[in-house]
């Protein structure tokens, strides 16, 4: 019998009220296209690290970032809805890509009044971006305090052997033009991820010197 993997506790990144992810007025999150998790209706504008790990992504608009835990779980925090269109206005990052953070560290501050006026919603989503890394996530309910209250418990997926991707396969390369002014973000990104999961392959994107799989 293999040993049990320890559960991962996710603290609330913001002070506010827990909201079921299915209730978020955006199908990308409500339908869990990005991943499963929870939402918070915030009372203030300070985002704390809900887990310890490495900042593996910080969006240019500073409204969203991803932390990878030591277990390999990627936690995406997305402040507000359609906040990418603010192009960083009202947001101040306190970390950079590659930084190591501990639970409770300050990640982002934002102007609550401005974001409330200029964005669709203040609802802040916290989701697991790589769902294959977990077996389940159990969100809490009610009011939570940023950096202090338990917001969810994650059961990591059992370790499994990965098949070797080396040799024997064909390589296909193509060019895609994205007319969306905000780029490959949110809904189009989630759609692409859903399509990619239908293939047993190593898929990489490259643009302007940046790459991602």
Question: Model-flagged regions — what are they?
Answer:
Residues 78, 177, 205-206:
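Conserved beta-strand segments of the P-loop GTPase G domain that flank and frequently precede/overlap
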Residues 157-175, 193, 197, 202-204:
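SAM-dependent methyltransferases
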Residues 1-167:
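Contiguous, well-folded functional domains in the mature portion of proteins
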Residues 73-77, 174, 212:
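Short beta-strand segments
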Residues 10-12, 169-180:
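Short amphipathic
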Residues 52-55, 175, 211:
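A general secondary-structure boundary signal
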Residues 183-196, 201-204, 210-213:
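Amphipathic alpha-helical interaction surfaces in cytosolic regulatory modules
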């Amino acid at each position: 019998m293999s040993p049990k993997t320890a559960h991962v506790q996710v603290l609330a990144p913001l002070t506010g009220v827990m909201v079921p992810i299915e209730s978020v007025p955006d199908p990308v999150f409500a339908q869990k296209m990005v991943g499963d998790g929870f939402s918070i209706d915030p009372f203030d504008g300070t985002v704390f690290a809900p887990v310890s790990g490495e900042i593996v992504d910080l969006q240019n608009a500073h409204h969203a970032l991803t932390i990878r835990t030591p277990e390999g779980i990627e936690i995406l925090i997305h402040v507000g809805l359609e906040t990418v269109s603010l192009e960083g206005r009202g947001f101040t990052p306190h970390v950079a890509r590659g930084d190591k953070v501990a639970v409770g560290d300050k990640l982002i501050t934002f102007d609550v009044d401005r974001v409330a006026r200029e964005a669709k919603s203040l609802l802040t989503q916290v989701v697991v971006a790589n769902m294959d890394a977990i077996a389940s996530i159990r969100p809490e309910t009610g009011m939570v305090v940023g950096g202090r209250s338990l917001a969810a418990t994650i059961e990591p997926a059992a370790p499994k052997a990965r098949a070797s991707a080396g040799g024997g396969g064909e390589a296909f390369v193509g060019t895609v033009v994205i007319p969306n002014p905000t780029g490959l973000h949110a809904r189009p990104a989630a759609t692409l991820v859903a399509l990619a999961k239908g293939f047993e392959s190593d898929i990489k994107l490259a643009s302007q010197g940046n790459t991602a799989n």
